[in-house]
Every structure is written in C-alpha cells, then in structure tokens.
A protein has these predicted regions:
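Short, hydrophobic transmembrane alpha-helix segments
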Residues: 27-39, 56-58, 79
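C-terminal transmembrane-bundle signature of multipass membrane proteins
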Residues: 167-231
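Alpha-helical transmembrane segments in multipass membrane proteins, preferentially the mid-helix core
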Residues: 135-149, 156-175
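Short, aromatic-rich membrane-interface segments at the entry and exit
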Residues: 36-44, 60-65, 84-89, 150-155, ...
Length: 231
C-alpha cells in the first residue's frame, strides 16, 4: 500500500500536486461556506478535479472518473432544471468518455497504458468536426426548447463546446482541453446566473472556475507531452 502511494506521489510533478491540492481545498472551502449546495454536487466537484489532473497526464483513469462525474453532474443539473446540461452529460459526455476510455487504452504511448498516444488533428479533420457540431447543436436547441430549459442560450453554447471537447478527446487531440476550457467559461456564466437567484449554487460556480484552470494546464501539458512523444 505504501509503495503504491509512493508511486502515485512520484507520478505527479510538484506543480500538479500543488494544482490538485489547491483545487480540492478551494472546492472544500466553498462547500463548507455554502453547505446547502448539497453533498452530491460537492462529491461531483472533487471527482471532477481528480479526473482533470489524470486527463492532463493523458492517463485513461481520467476518462473513467469523467464517466462518474458526468452521471452525478447530470443529476445535479436536473435539480436546477438545466436540462441541457443533464442531457449533454448523461447522453453525450458520459458515453463519449466511455468510448474515449476504450480508445485511450487501445492506443497507449509505449508499453505502459498510463499515457495515451497523442496525435494532432489535420485541417480536414477539424473542418469535419466543426461541421458535425452544427447539426448537433441545432438538434439540441429544439430538444432543450421543448423541455423549457432555463437560460437556453448558454445551455446551447455548452452543448456545442461539450461536443467539440468529447470529440477531440476521442480523437486523442490536445484541443480537447481547449474546448473544455471554453465550456468551463460558458458554465461559469450559467451557474453565475443561477447563483444570482440562489447562493446555494455558488459552489458549482467555483467548481467550473477551478476546472478552467485545470483544463488550461491540460492543454499546455498535452502539447508538451506530444513534443516528448515525437522526439
């Protein structure tokens, strides 16, 4: 047990350990200050923080944690009538994370499965992914409108950026983190609007602010890893 903990400790860099610890402390403090936000949302935020640091390392464990986070977050979103978030995470992010987990395990870097083989997306591939995003977004617009989704504009933008993020993740491309960072910004706005009505949602606002910092690091680190893998 001690050897495993030592191995895990040495796996992360000093910066990554600081980033993870800071993220967990901020999320915990937010929950302590606003305990009415609910234990479920707190658990989701902690799982999310762990998933992002593993994803930033290109580790498939991150995708497994995203599946768990997506299911819990979908439940929290349902309680807020954010049906767009609920449908996006339960119906798109979780299944795509499962597909990404399979893809990452099938495409390891070297002999170890602890790091995925990273690839860059070409111009044609980017164009196809962007074009696919348009009909998906339009379809979700009508679905969300039918369900009377609160704050439908940011919800639709969240769908678009989430689709980009999960697709780039599946394709093992560093742009996944950039798309998730864009999604974080939209969700910050979404939960800010909810927090104005009820401060109980401030921990969710804090959650995605923390995720934004982690996703930015993920993008930077994946580009660094890609250079290392290419050398």
């Amino acid at each position: 047990m001690k050897s495993k903990l030592r191995s895990l400790n040495s796996y992360f860099t000093g910066f990554e350990k600081t980033l993870l610890t800071s993220s967990l402390l901020i999320l915990t403090m937010s929950y302590i200050i606003f305990p009415d936000s609910g234990t479920l949302s707190f658990i989701a935020s902690l799982i999310g923080a762990f998933s992002l640091i593993f994803c930033a390392k290109g580790n498939p464990v991150g995708q497994l944690l995203i599946i768990i986070f997506s299911i819990i977050y979908a439940v929290v979103s349902y309680g807020m009538c954010y049906y767009g978030e609920m449908i996006t995470y339960a119906g798109m992010t979780a299944p795509m994370a499962a597909a990404s987990l399979y893809t990452w395990l099938r495409n390891p870097y070297g002999r170890s499965r602890s790091q995925v083989k990273i690839r860059s997306a070409g111009g044609k591939e980017l164009a196809v992914i962007i074009l696919l995003t348009i009909p998906v977004t339009v379809l979700f617009y009508f679905i969300l409108k039918y369900f009377g989704t609160a704050n439908i504009i940011p919800s639709i933008l969240s769908v678009a950026t989430s689709f980009l993020a999960v697709t780039f993740t599946l394709r093992r491309c560093a742009l996944y983190a950039l798309a998730y960072a864009m999604n974080d910004l939209i969700l910050i706005v979404l939960w800010l609007l909810a927090s104005v009505e009820n401060t109980v949602y401030i921990p969710m606002l804090t959650c995605f602010a923390v995720f934004l910092v982690n996703d930015i690091y993920g993008f930077i680190n994946w580009n660094r890893l890609m250079k290392q893998q290419s050398s």
